[in-house]
Amino acid sequence: MIEYIKGDIAEITPATVVLDCNGMGYGINISLNTYSAIQNQSNTKLYIYEAIREDAYVLYGFSTKQERELFLLLISVSGIGGNTARMILSALSPSELCGVISSGNDKLLKTVKGIGLKTAQRIIVDLKDKIATSGVETVNSEMFANPGNTEIHDEAVAALTMLGFAQAASQKVVAAILKEEPAAPVEKVIKLALKRL
């Protein structure tokens, strides 16, 4: 079993990274959270989950043990596979996801691509008690669901979702940009968001 892989970043995209470890390149699936954490590094260490199936051997990598722990909790829920769990962890940071589950915010959870209302409710029911003991610090889901600059926020999120980005991921990125630059016009917010999504 692989616990972690440490090596040079040979290639990186928002969804995958190739780590060169002693001349061997490991193709690893990553979330947007992990991408944000490692994109400017030349060398990194990723905590690994191995998904071994009849037709594939897939590696998922995480910049923190907490993110991997949440991934394992998510795939323990009936109907949630590795790619869906990675999509959820791309849309919400570990602390945000814990906040959403703790507060039972199924509306925000179902904005993640591929998650319907029933699945969102199942995640909350199955994981609420486990999240309470996970040790990940939670963020109040209302904090990023309703940022102050709502008009520009809503306009930018609408534009990004029309371009095919997941609503939850778009909301998160736009909220972060408006926190950094509260006076930014909507065009600038969208341009900055496109670089981060």
From Swiss-Prot:
Coiled-coil features, chain-numbered ranges: none
Annotated segments matching region Domain I: 1-63
Gene3D superfamilies, sorted: 5' to 3' exonuclease, C-terminal subdomain, DNA helicase RuvA subunit, C-terminal domain, Nucleic acid-binding proteins
Region: Domain III, residue numbers: 148-197
Similarity comment text for this entry: Belongs to the RuvA family.
GO cellular component, one term: Holliday junction helicase complex
Biological processes annotated in GO: DNA recombination; DNA repair
Function: The RuvA-RuvB-RuvC complex processes Holliday junction (HJ) DNA during genetic recombination and DNA repair, while the RuvA-RuvB complex plays an important role in the rescue of blocked DNA replication forks via replication fork reversal (RFR). RuvA specifically binds to HJ cruciform DNA, conferring on it an open structure. The RuvB hexamer acts as an ATP-dependent pump, pulling dsDNA into and through the RuvAB complex. HJ branch migration allows RuvC to scan DNA until it finds its consensus sequence, where it cleaves and resolves the cruciform DNA.
Compartments it resides in: Cytoplasm
Name of the protein in its database record: Holliday junction branch migration complex subunit RuvA
Subunit structure: Homotetramer. Forms an RuvA(8)-RuvB(12)-Holliday junction (HJ) complex. HJ DNA is sandwiched between 2 RuvA tetramers; dsDNA enters through RuvA and exits via RuvB. An RuvB hexamer assembles on each DNA strand where it exits the tetramer. Each RuvB hexamer is contacted by two RuvA subunits (via domain III) on 2 adjacent RuvB subunits; this complex drives branch migration. In the full resolvosome a probable DNA-RuvA(4)-RuvB(12)-RuvC(2) complex forms which resolves the HJ.
Originating species: Phocaeicola vulgatus (strain ATCC 8482 / DSM 1447 / JCM 5826 / CCUG 4940 / NBRC 14291 / NCTC 11154)
Keyword Transmembrane attributed: no
Flexible linker: region residues: 143-147
GO molecular function: ATP binding; four-way junction DNA binding; four-way junction helicase activity
Disulfide pattern: none
Region annotation (Domain II) ranges: 64-142
Domain-related comment: Has three domains with a flexible linker between the domains II and III and assumes an 'L' shape. Domain III is highly mobile and contacts RuvB.
Superkingdom field: Bacteria
UniProt entry tagged with the keyword Signal: no
InterPro entries linked: DNA_helicase_Holl-junc_RuvA_I, Hlx-hairpin-Hlx_DNA-bd_motif, NA-bd_OB-fold, RuvA, RuvA_2-like, RuvA_C, RuvA_C_sf
Cross-referenced Pfam families: HHH_5, RuvA_C, RuvA_N
Record keywords: Cytoplasm, DNA damage, DNA recombination, DNA repair, DNA-binding
